[in-house]
């Protein structure tokens, strides 16, 4: 599967054995989210900016979570946190993510019709959303390459194998 999503989610088994660290891409995503949602460009983010930045990074944060982060990290009582604090919080949260759970979330992004499988239609939609200009022939070839049970679609088990490199 040549879509960008695969590259972001492939689980590196050697890293799981060592202390996990963020990739350069993940570090850049954190920086970009902070800069994008620091709307007043004061090098700190408030409650609303923090909540939106966390959501942009894939976290479904509750009001209580955001308030706790602000309480724990707002040392100057400004109602805001700095990039350094944001980076510390988000890095911890990212490293606590379960890679298997992230793969299942990605599968659900493809399987928007809840069929339990990724069809040609699902794959075509995702490719289009990612700006990939791929023909149906190319998309079918991708499915065929990983479709171990030969049903013309990618089921959850096959998707997990793709994403973990257990093909």
Curated annotation (Swiss-Prot):
Record-level Gene Ontology MF annotations: calcium ion binding; G-protein beta/gamma-subunit complex binding; microtubule binding
Keywords: Calcium, Cell cycle, Cell division, Cytoplasm, Cytoskeleton, Metal-binding, Mitosis, mRNA transport, Nuclear pore complex, Nucleus, Phosphoprotein, Protein transport, Repeat, Translocation, Transport
Matches recorded under PROSITE patterns: EF_HAND_1, EF_HAND_2
Modified residues (Phosphoserine): 135
SMART domains: EFh
Chain sites annotated for binding Ca(2+) 2: 147, 149, 151, 153, 158
Alphabetical GO biological process terms: cell division; mRNA transport; protein transport
GO cellular component: centriole; centrosome; ciliary basal body; ciliary transition zone; cytoplasm; nuclear pore nuclear basket; nucleolus; photoreceptor connecting cilium
Major location category of this protein: cytoplasm
Residues engaged in binding Ca(2+) 1: 38, 40, 42, 49
Record has Ribosomal protein as a keyword: no
Coiled-coil blocks: none
SUPFAM superfamilies: EF-hand
PANTHER family: CENTRIN 3 (PTHR23048:SF48), MYOSIN LIGHT CHAIN 1, 3 (PTHR23048)
Similarity comment: Belongs to the centrin family.
UniProt subunit comment: Monomer. Component of the TREX-2 complex (transcription and export complex 2), composed of at least ENY2, GANP, PCID2, SEM1, and either centrin CETN2 or CETN3. Interacts with USP49.
Function according to Swiss-Prot or TrEMBL: Plays a fundamental role in microtubule-organizing center structure and function. As a component of the TREX-2 complex, involved in the export of mRNAs to the cytoplasm through the nuclear pores.
Protein name, entry field: Centrin-3
